[in-house]
Amino acid sequence: MSVSIPHGGTLINRWNPDYPLDEATKTIELSKAELSDLELIGTGAYSPLTGFLTKTDYDAVVETMRLSDGTVWSIPITLAVTEEKAKELAVGDKAKLVYRGDVYGVIEIADIYRPDKTKEAKLVYKTDELAHPGVRKLFEKPDVYVGGEITLVKRTDKGQFASFYFDPAETRKKFAEFGWNTVVGFQTRNPVHRAHEYIQKCALEIVDGLFLNPLVGETKADDIPADIRMESYQVLLENYYPKDRVFLGVFQAAMRYAGPREAIFHAMVRKNFGCTHFIVGRDHAGVGNYYGTYDAQKIFLNFTAEELGITPLFFEHSFYCTKCEGMASTKTCPHDAKYHVVLSGTKVREMLRNGQVPPSTFSRPEVAAVLIKGLQERETVAPSAR
């Protein structure tokens, strides 16, 4: 029997809708990504974090992929304010955390500091090029960081995905109700095609259940929109997966595109949701050619199994082999690449937007139909909206 222990040993809960807001005399405006982070800290998804990073923890995370106490943590979770706003704030202040006029939380300010963004970019993203979407977001943010413990006082409106939002305490309860002792998490910002289905089902052979946890926070403009992806996941699970072995729930964080570091981060978060295993494929959380194909797998070697507390499952690039007449990878298929059905994400998106159905050896026809319909509807609406 295997049981997932929250990262750091305790599932953090910073939710208090009755917090006395009149104690918070200052105000900080959040970005959409910071709002997501606030809620994920508050609900324990980012355990052991209890707030936005202070300089001591920030420096440790950027330089060592650990918090100052040595706990594995690879992505800096920060709250940025302008120089003008920073002049209004002082250590010891309590500030309301506001998004579009609504107060979602309070921070007890423990630190105000100016990060070295170039250093953060080079160490976290492995580049300081503004062409990298994560780096661009980093440099677009204000130049001062505010650290301190938070209290979550209001939950965000989950909209059309409301029935798929689950806090870590809820997923842990669900997995226990299902009788799942071992659960594998799968992170994605893309539709699930045959290659993803193959590695998920390979993982399902050795665990009790699959937690399909697609990211629905901020992504790149050319990524498939979340609403279309969610419909495609549902039709795939309905037609091709055992219903008692899979659980679908969304992950509201913004995409960082930090490649290897984000793979560690995604694993730690799924550990908090109750997963005992986590799938790491090729170029996990990558973008462009900034990371090596399997860098996101190699980075796990920097930590012991005990430090991670979740078992990464590494998979090589998968494809349909016409000679094997089935899904395979370079580990299991001896045939030449000319027998492999491989399409780039860019090529597939182009086909779908043009109404072309990818081969069934690449994508399930039901999934392709949903994606084509959704993208074409989006295209007809988009020109008038631009």
Curated annotation (Swiss-Prot):
Protein's name in the database: Sulfate adenylyltransferase
Keywords, sorted A to Z: ATP-binding, Nucleotide-binding, Nucleotidyltransferase, Transferase
Gene3D superfamilies assigned: HUPs, Sulfate adenylyltransferase
Membrane-spanning intervals of the chain: none
SUPFAM superfamilies: Nucleotidylyl transferase (SSF52374), PUA domain-like (SSF88697)
EC number: 2.7.7.4
GO molecular function: ATP binding; sulfate adenylyltransferase (ATP) activity
Keyword Transmembrane helix (UniProt): no
Reactions accelerated catalytically: sulfate + ATP + H(+) = adenosine 5'-phosphosulfate + diphosphate
Organism the protein comes from: Geobacillus kaustophilus (strain HTA426)
Pathway(s) where this gene product acts: Sulfur metabolism; hydrogen sulfide biosynthesis; sulfite from sulfate: step 1/3
One Gene Ontology biological process: sulfate assimilation
Family: Belongs to the sulfate adenylyltransferase family.
InterPro entries on file: ATP-Sase_PUA-like_dom, PUA-like_sf, Rossmann-like_a/b/a_fold, SO4_adenylyltransferase_pro, Sulfurylase_cat_dom, Sulphate_adenylyltransferase
